[in-house]
Amino acid sequence: MNNSMINPSIVDLLTKVGDRYSLVILTSKRAREIIEGAEPLTKVDSHKPLTIAINEVNEDIVKYEE
């Protein structure tokens, strides 16, 4: 079994968004935008849309608006 750490951690992400539900909504919507052709707003080593979206949230590039 692989015990790899998720980076950034869920705790760090929740300080930026507030709750898990909002985090899921925000990252999934942003990942969908990237899948549909939107340019990534940050440089990451991954080509996975969800990983890019999570890093954008972590870097405060994409923010949750109520």
Curated annotation (Swiss-Prot):
Pfam families on file: RNA_pol_Rpb6
What Gene3D superfamilies does its record include?
A: 3.90.940.10
GO BP, sorted A to Z:
DNA-templated transcription
Q: Which EC numbers characterise this protein's activity in its record? A: 2.7.7.6
| Keyword annotations of the record | DNA-directed RNA polymerase, Nucleotidyltransferase, Transcription, Transferase
* InterPro entries, sorted: DNA-dir_RNA_pol_omega (IPR003716), Pol_omega/Rpo6/RPB6 (IPR006110), RPB6/omega-like_sf (IPR036161)
Q: Which reaction does it catalyse?
A: RNA(n) + a ribonucleoside 5'-triphosphate = RNA(n+1) + diphosphate
- GO molecular-function terms, A-Z: DNA binding; DNA-directed RNA polymerase activity
Which GO cellular component terms are attached?
Answer: DNA-directed RNA polymerase complex
Function description: Promotes RNA polymerase assembly. Latches the N- and C-terminal regions of the beta' subunit thereby facilitating its interaction with the beta and alpha subunits.
SUBUNIT field? The RNAP catalytic core consists of 2 alpha, 1 beta, 1 beta' and 1 omega subunit. When a sigma factor is associated with the core the holoenzyme is formed, which can initiate transcription.
Q: In which family does this protein belong, per the annotation? A: Belongs to the RNA polymerase subunit omega family.
- This chain's protein is named DNA-directed RNA polymerase subunit omega
- Species of origin reads Clostridium botulinum (strain Eklund 17B / Type B)
Q: Which gene encodes it?
A: rpoZ
